[in-house]
Amino acid sequence: MKGTSEISSWISANCHRLSGDKQVCSEEIAIIAGGSRVRHIPPLVSALLIPDMPVAVWWVGDLPNEEQAYVETLLDPADRLIVDSSHFDRVEDLIWLHQIAERTFTAPADLNWVKLEDWRLVTAALFDAPSMRERLHDIRTLNITAIGGTQSLFGDSIESLYYAAWMIAQTGSDEIDNTFFIEPGDDTGAIMQVKIGFSGGFEVVIARDVAKGIVTATVGGKTQTLDCVARILGRSTEDLIVR
């Protein structure tokens, strides 16, 4: 482990006022370690945990593949691991996430998948119409354009990768060609446009207009505004965490 070999901690109370005079309070214990001292973190955390309470580990940033044994020791008492795969820099991070789910009792949860929920809802709503549902198995191409705001091209591509995998799972087809485009911008990995190509040349384009705060779908050359809006509020990672 890199960094200065030191360890420090502090405790603070956080209170949230509810209706009336009631409030919900919690204690937050922060431990910061560097260098060789990080080895002391797992036993310290275990000693501070309240028995029979659910435990979640929120890992901020990229997963340290070179320290798998250490991370899995830290996850030993955890029920859930929360990550944001937009910070991942290589495919091995996703493979390791799968291995954690397979060989430990900790269930991984990816905020990047949660951020994709609105796009999945929009797409599913589009195929609610019987005429579109009949075309579901005729999908041949997916062209996905996303915004890249990090140094990791792989991390910026994961939301698009998740969307493509989800679409392929819905169709049950392995004959869909996928193309990902990354454009520079501030909204890390956020999908901006999806082009769905069908056999026979039919095409559907789903796009979000951040300036207008709308999502449109162009089906067979006709454009409509969708009621279900995909990420126009710009939900950040902080918005997805319940404290």
What do the predicted segments below correspond to?
Residues S9-C15, G149, L161-R243:
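C-terminal structured domains
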Residues N14-L18, R80-V83, I100-A107, L111, ...:
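Acidic, Ser/Thr-rich peripheral helices and adjacent loops at domain boundaries
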Residues N112-T179:
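ATP/pyrophosphate-binding catalytic subdomain of soluble kinases
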